[in-house]
Amino acid sequence: MKTNFTVLFAIIIFSSVPFLRGDTFSFRADSMTGGKATGREITVLTGNAEVRSDKLLLQAERIEIQGSDNRFIDCIGNVRGMEEEKNILFQTDRLRYDRTLKIARLEGNSTLEDRKNEIVARSRFIEYNDSQEIAIFQISVRLFKDNLVCRSEYAIYRRQEKTLALSGFPVVYKKDDEFRANRIQVDLNTDDVAMEGDVKGSIIN
């Protein structure tokens, strides 16, 4: 029989599990299994699973919480997440999160939406460093912003600087204009493009 453990989970978390200082942590799901054997601490949440770690909210079909101080979170199946303070949304097949380093790794069909900067990016792998506000995208990278469309196999997005570095057959489309090179740097404030190596382009006047 499955039971909603929301209240029970809160009791377990706040009464018996050590925390990272200054980090609020809670979780809920339809069912739970777990153990606290030394060196093998693991809690498995299934069915409408949800974890909140400070400003980060994660939801998935299954979530595994492991390690001392619940350091590692592994979300599997229809994963959705939101960094509430920065207004960043995630969607992916699988997400692994390190609460100490504040690094999220998204695997499979993955989307990152930065609502503040009005950017949507998709790829097969995303690594987001929340402390540095840097995202790395790999494999079938697509980034959309207003009339700007960027494609490549590898990209680095620096959120604070609002810059995008593209490599691996990069292409940038600005309305009807097209730019290709070995490496392309995009200023997302102005949509200006800087290119290096085998530069090609077409501009519609």
Predicted regions and their residues:
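Mature-chain termini and adjacent capping regions
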Residues: M1-N205
